A protein has these predicted regions:
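Conserved small/polar residues in nucleotide/adenosyl-binding loops
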Residues: 115-120
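Hydrophobic anchor at the beta1->P-loop junction of P-loop NTPases
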Residues: 12
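ATP-dependent small-molecule kinase phosphotransfer cores
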Residues: 38-96
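ATP-binding Walker
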Residues: 18
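Walker A/P-loop
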Residues: 21
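Conserved phosphate-donor/acceptor-positioning beta-strand/loop module used by diverse small-molecule
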Residues: 98-114
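P-loop (Walker A) phosphate-binding loop of NTP-binding proteins
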Residues: 15
Length: 120
């Protein structure tokens, strides 16, 4: 990753269930950008669900996968990247976020609970 800032690289951050994976494709479509969901990328490359990764190898290994996915996505311009809910809490990921615009999807914990309940 070059570390160069690009206005055509947009990171979506927010709590799990805040709508990053829903808003991301819509925003990408409007802007004629590519969309990347880092959780989906991790699941595709690892062959495991996020829950399975956490269970089998733990959060630290998951965060390493997440950082790799974010770096790969950030190599591109004209892209909207939905980051995992905890991604911004790790220093290495914060450096990647500095390479583009960051949009925080602000949602209350109560709304997240409602969203999760509706999904199940």
């Amino acid at each position: 990753m070059s570390g160069t800032f690009s206005e055509n690289r947009i990171f979506l951050i927010g709590l799990s269930g805040s709508g990053k994976s829903t808003v991301g494709p819509l925003l990408a479509s409007i802007l004629h950008f590519t969309f990347c969901d880092t959780d989906s990328l991790i699941e595709k490359t690892s062959g495991q669900s996020i829950a399975e990764i956490f269970k089998d190898v733990g959060e630290l290994t998951f965060r390493k996968h997440e950082n790799i996915a974010m770096r790969e996505a950030a190599e591109k311009d004209n892209i909207v990247i939905a980051c995992g809910g905890g991604a911004p809490t790790f220093l290495a990921n914060q450096e990647i976020l500095k390479t583009g615009k960051v949009i925080w999807l602000d949602i209350t914990p109560e709304d997240v609970s409602y969203t999760h309940l509706r999904a199940h």
